[in-house]
Every structure is written in C-alpha cells, then in structure tokens.
Amino acid sequence: MSFKPLHDRIAIKPIEQEEKTKGGIIIPDTVKEKPMQGEIVAVGNGIRNKKGEIHPLELKVGDKVLYGKWAGTEIEIKGTKLIVMKESDVFGIIN
C-alpha cells in the first residue's frame, strides 16, 4: 500500500462481518452493521509535545483493534477500503 498517515493518525482495514448467519441466512448489505473492528495497515510518526519532541504511537501495523462505529474517514486506495482516524479514536487492541 502506498499511504502513510501523518502525525497521530492511523489507517485501518475494516474486518467485514459474515455474509451469512450460522443458520445459512444471507445478510443483505442494506442491513449490515458498519464494521467496528479492523487491522491497522499504516501508522503516522507520532504526535509532538510542547517541547517539539515526537512521541511514537502505541498502536502498530498488524494490531487488530476495536473502534467507534462513526470514527474516522473512509477512503479507498488502489481498490482497498480503509478508515483513517486518530489513535485516540481506538477503544483497544483485540488479542
């Protein structure tokens, strides 16, 4: 991928929910919930403090995270849908 977020921003590839239920019922796109889990694919360098020092982000590429339903901005790079948001919009890392 050729996208590098700036400062305290991260790029997340959403993890889509299943197309079918366990019982075999197909879920149409119109009723699917917006994904709230994803994998981090790019991170910014960090945020500057008052002294001008850059503090790196806690999150790293490959982390699976949980974020708010309406967090971030959706973009598309080379056919891949991503969500760009601030690190502080992430609730936590999924183990």
From Swiss-Prot:
CDD domains the record matches: cpn10
Gene field: groES
Protein name: Co-chaperonin GroES
Task of the protein: Together with the chaperonin GroEL, plays an essential role in assisting protein folding. The GroEL-GroES system forms a nano-cage that allows encapsulation of the non-native substrate proteins and provides a physical environment optimized to promote and accelerate protein folding. GroES binds to the apical surface of the GroEL ring, thereby capping the opening of the GroEL channel.
GO biological process: chaperone cofactor-dependent protein refolding
A Gene Ontology molecular function term of the record: ATP binding
Subunit structure, as described in the record: Heptamer of 7 subunits arranged in a ring. Interacts with the chaperonin GroEL.
Entry similarity comment: Belongs to the GroES chaperonin family.
PROSITE patterns: CHAPERONINS_CPN10 (PS00681)
